[in-house]
Curated annotation (Swiss-Prot):
It comes from Candida albicans (strain SC5314 / ATCC MYA-2876). This is Large ribosomal subunit protein uL6. Component of the large ribosomal subunit. Mature ribosomes consist of a small (40S) and a large (60S) subunit. The 40S subunit contains about 32 different proteins and 1 molecule of RNA (18S). The 60S subunit contains 45 different proteins and 3 molecules of RNA (25S, 5.8S and 5S). Component of the ribosome, a large ribonucleoprotein complex responsible for the synthesis of proteins in the cell. The small ribosomal subunit (SSU) binds messenger RNAs (mRNAs) and translates the encoded message by selecting cognate aminoacyl-transfer RNA (tRNA) molecules. The large subunit (LSU) contains the ribosomal catalytic site termed the peptidyl transferase center (PTC), which catalyzes the formation of peptide bonds, thereby polymerizing the amino acids delivered by tRNAs into a polypeptide chain. GO terms for cellular component: cytosolic large ribosomal subunit. GO terms for biological process: cytoplasmic translation. Belongs to the universal ribosomal protein uL6 family. Pfam families: Ribosomal_L6. The keyword Transcription regulation does not apply. The gene is RPL9B. It is found in: Cytoplasm. One of its GO terms (molecular function) is structural constituent of ribosome. InterPro entries: Ribosomal_uL6-like, Ribosomal_uL6-like_a/b-dom_sf, Ribosomal_uL6_a/b-dom, Ribosomal_uL6_CS2.
Length: 191
């Protein structure tokens, strides 16, 4: 079944501007600016006023309508990023060998360096994405805080760190060591 026209309306909060040129969305807010290229998705954008955007799909089937809702969510994530930012907290889990995590600079690029994982000599390094800041928590032992404006960059960095600390060739029910995401949220907490 084809839907002749399907609309989604996205409200823009105060202090945020959204510019759309040739399906490249640029969102500017108090925390900075984010850009997302949506040229591969066949949707139409109309600014109702400066406070709302109408996203439309013409003659779309179920997959196109689902893509419409995806586009709305992506832009909503950009708006949240430039207003509140995103923060992931990661905890180090180990039974015997304490995991040693440092943030290092190498060739002008920042890396997270993971040592002594399961007592291994191998040093694991994860590149920190652009626009993402990492710090080792001063209040909580064995905690890494990943924060930034782009949800994609922050969550991908957290996933990269969690993935590089996977236990291989052992029973994962017994060997629970690793670095796991313990908390997700925004930098600016809602009251």
């Amino acid at each position: 079944m084809k839907y002749i026209q399907t609309d989604q309306i996205l409200d823009i909060p105060e202090g945020v501007t959204v510019d759309i040129k040739a399906r490249v969305v640029k969102v500017t807010g108090p925390r900075g600016e984010l850009t997302k290229d949506l040229k591969h998705i066949d949707v139409t954008f109309n600014k109702i006023n400066n406070r709302a955007i109408k996203i439309t799909v013409h003659n779309g089937d179920r997959k196109h309508v689902a893509a419409l809702r995806t586009v709305k969510s992506l832009i909503a994530n950009l708006i949240t990023g430039v207003t509140k930012g995103y923060k992931y907290k990661m905890r180090f889990v180990y039974a015997h060998f304490p995991i040693n995590v440092n943030i290092i600079k190498k060739d002008g690029q920042d890396y997270v360096e993971i040592r002594n994982f399961l007592g291994e000599k191998r040093v694991r390094e994860v590149k920190i994405h652009e626009g993402v800041t990492m710090e080792i928590s001063s209040t909580q032992k064995d905690e890494l805080i990943v924060s930034g404006n782009s949800l994609e960059a922050v969550s991908q960095n957290a996933a990269d760190i969690q993935q590089i600390c996977r236990v291989r060739n052992k029973d994962i029910r017994k060997f629970l060591d690793g670095i796991y995401v313990s908390e997700r949220g925004t930098i600016v907490e809602e009251i």
